Amino acid sequence: MARFRGSITKVSRRLGVALAPKAEKYLERRPYAPGEHGQSRRSKISEYALQLREKQKMKFLYGVLEKQFRNYYKKAVAQRGVTGDNLVKLLERRFDNVVFRAGFSPSRAGARQLVTHGHMLVNGRKVNIPSFLMKPGDAIEFREKSKNMDAVTESLNKAPESRIPSWIQVDKAHQKAVFLTVPEREEVQEPFNEQLVVELYSK
């Protein structure tokens, strides 16, 4: 599937949120939209623009393009419960997201590369599909020939225990993890309002 190839830093500044670790320092230094008039853009934003911005945040944060994102929304609507909560839970169950949450990569983009390049196993079988949805109890680990890669070891060493969520159990020494349970919405700390996205799609 095609992926975004533009400047993630510019998109982060436009949306007002760091979409990747490398964008954090730039956003701290220039917390306004890019361009000549970025600092002066203070006009009132419309309801539609707010909804669209929240959708863009979610898509870029999880690395999902429009068609797939809309499919997640349709699945969320079909499930029992709150549609917005269901949408977030589906995105959190993505294989590349779980690899990122486990600390195997400092970014979701990096985690997606680990998956697509065939470095990862799920329950002992190679899975190279980033959108593969994890189920409670699923175990992830590296293929034998991919273990102890420098980038992974460095990421695990830098990842504080507080960053690894309670719904993922990580064995840093053996570079393994278990997806314990689907997180509740309040456990997912991300800078977006999914309810505005639901309102946008339900029009």
UniProtKB/Swiss-Prot annotation:
Keyword Oxidoreductase: no
Superkingdom of origin organism: Bacteria
UniProt cross-references to InterPro entries, sorted A to Z: Ribosomal_uS4, Ribosomal_uS4_bac-type, Ribosomal_uS4_N, S4_RNA-bd, S4_RNA-bd_sf
Gene Ontology molecular function: rRNA binding; structural constituent of ribosome
Example GO BP: translation
GO terms for cellular component: small ribosomal subunit
Alphabetical keyword list: Ribonucleoprotein, Ribosomal protein, RNA-binding, rRNA-binding
Entry keyword Ribosomal protein: yes
Occurrences of domain S4 RNA-binding (ranges): 93-154
NCBIfam families named among the record's database cross-references: PRK05327.1, rpsD_bact
PANTHER family registered for this protein in UniProt: 30S 40S RIBOSOMAL PROTEIN, SMALL RIBOSOMAL SUBUNIT PROTEIN US4M
Function (record text): One of the primary rRNA binding proteins, it binds directly to 16S rRNA where it nucleates assembly of the body of the 30S subunit. With S5 and S12 plays an important role in translational accuracy.
Subunit structure: Part of the 30S ribosomal subunit. Contacts protein S5. The interaction surface between S4 and S5 is involved in control of translational fidelity.
Protein name in the entry: Small ribosomal subunit protein uS4
Organism encoding this protein: Prosthecochloris aestuarii (strain DSM 271 / SK 413)
